[in-house]
Design a protein with these regions (language model features):
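Conserved catalytic motifs of ABC-family nucleotide-binding domains
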Residues: 167
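Helix-to-loop junction immediately C-terminal to a conserved catalytic motif
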Residues: 56
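Conserved ABC ATPase signature
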Residues: 146-150, 154
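Conserved ABC transporter NBD signature motif
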Residues: 64-72
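Conserved ABC ATPase "signature" region
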Residues: 72, 123-141, 250
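Short catalytic/signature loops enriched in Gly
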Residues: 2-4, 21, 231-281
């Protein structure tokens, strides 16, 4: 029997826009197994980030249930909701706007610890922060610097350390590498892979393309227009995608081998020509 840490059933989120109801998330259901990384992939406006925010109750679902460890978090209030927020944390997309520019690194990372463990001694908190900085690839002498002193990749590492500070079981990552240079993206993805392996973290990883999740995620769910079009293992989606939208995402993944890329391009052109010929007949 699979141990599911997260169960999402019939999740729907509607917004009122100029007097009309817009459905951003439309009857979405999926599970996340404990210790795995599930990728949630789709183009801008597909509803993936809204889904992530509903999962963490950063916004309230219109309908549906979200269970973590068997508990429906949509019904939680006050202390129970606070406890849930220690078990599930988010890493945001923009490392520039997600950190308070007036707070030093030690204050940013300590904030969650102070909320969930208000009696923790200052020396203990400092030791934990130093350890977290080392875990994410930063140095102890970064403690008293402001966010402006860091690059985008370093700021994202600070954001990851902040999320880890309360020892979560689930990390929801909302396009955490989308704003970074390609070389830095690889480093951050490797960090998530390492955290998953060494800390037993479960990841719900949001991305806008399949290339980003290719080496990190165990399973992938593809979203379009608020609904999940296809979900399966990484191997299933990359080798035998069933939904036409998934197939288009696969076709858009860059191929590092130029010979293989030409082969794929030739195959796509041949398939397109065959469809045209079939229509003409």
């Amino acid at each position: 029997m699979t141990d599911d840490i997260l169960e999402v059933e019939h999740l729907t989120r509607e917004f009122s826009v100029r007097g009309e109801t817009v459905t951003a998330v439309d009857d979405v259901s999926f599970t996340v197994h404990r210790g795995e990384a599930l990728g949630l992939v789709g183009e801008s406006g597909s509803g993936k980030s809204t889904t992530a925010r509903c999962v963490l109750r950063l916004i309230e679902p219109t309908r549906g249930t979200v269970r973590m460890n068997g508990v429906d978090i949509t019904t939680l209030r006050r202390r129970a909701l606070k406890d849930f927020r220690a078990r599930a944390q988010m890493v945001f997309q923009d490392p520039y706007s997600s950190l308070d520019p007036r707070m030093r690194v030690r204050e940013i990372i300590a904030e969650g610890i102070r909320i969930h463990r208000p009696r923790a001694k200052d020396s203990v908190v400092t030791d934990e922060i130093v350890e977290l900085l080392e875990v994410v690839g930063l140095r102890p002498d970064h403690l008293d610097r402001l966010p402006a002193a860091f690059s985008g990749g370093e700021r994202q590492r600070i954001g990851i350390a902040r999320a880890l500070a309360v020892n979560p079981e689930l990390l929801v990552c909302d396009e955490p590498v989308a704003s970074l240079d390609v070389s830095i993206q690889a480093q951050i993805l490797n960090l998530f892979q390492e955290l998953k392996a060494t800390r037993g973290l479960t990841l719900l990883f949001i991305a806008h393309d399949l290339a980003t999740v290719r080496h990190l995620c165990d399973r992938v769910a593809v979203m379009q227009q608020g609904a999940i079009r296809e979900i399966g293992t990484r191997e299933q989606l990359y080798t035998n995608p069933q939904d036409p939208y998934t197939q288009s995402l696969i076709a858009a993944v860059p191929e590092p081998n130029p010979i293989e890329e030409r082969r794929k391009l030739t195959a796509r052109r041949a398939a397109a020509a065959a469809k045209v010929a079939e229509g003409a007949a």
